[in-house]
Amino acid sequence: DFCEDLEILYVEGHSQDGTLDEIYRVIESYPDKDIKVLVQDGKGKGDAVRKGFDNARGDILMILDADLTVPPEDLPKFYEVIASGKGEYINGTRLVYPMENDAMRFLNFLANRTFSVIFTWLLNQRITDTLCGTKVLTKKNYNKIVANRSYFGEFDPFGDFDLIFGAAK
């Protein structure tokens, strides 16, 4: 545990592969942990991110995608940067370190690189992986992003772009 008051929220998006049963099995295996399940009302990652963040009670919010392309063991590093005040928004990256073969399809890699170049230019801030699922920010800053979300509305299906643009404002 890297923080005293850790809350884990699983946002389940109506999967048909037994994910919800597995989540409940994990919860039963760790009765001393604060683990909750939220069943997604809408569709897509963006909706899941908003559902999780809106229901989180903590001051520091983290996203870890189920594909685990960023190892959970790296989360304490992200947490420390935010908790120490050295950063306000942390966007993970999968594209600066060697990846396993087939970890990302070529077209996804190419699109992500293209988004990274565009976002770096638009925001005047180096962004190496716009679609990395690992992101960390404070609840206070997330609430500011929500209050100013009108530039994207609910359009962002990934839940990545509105966070990146919102954090840059």
PLM segments and residue spans:
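Conserved donor nucleotide-binding strand/loop of the catalytic core
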Residues: 6-10, 20-55
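Acceptor/aglycone-binding surface of glycosyltransferases and processive sugar-polymer synthases
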Residues: 40-55, 60, 72-154
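Hydrophobic residues within well-ordered alpha-helices
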Residues: 82, 163, 167-168
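A conserved acidic beta->alpha catalytic loop
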Residues: 12-21, 68
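Acidic donor-binding loop at a coil-to-helix junction in glycosyltransferase catalytic cores
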Residues: 154-163
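Short, acidic, metal-binding catalytic loop of nucleotide-sugar glycosyltransferases
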Residues: 1-5
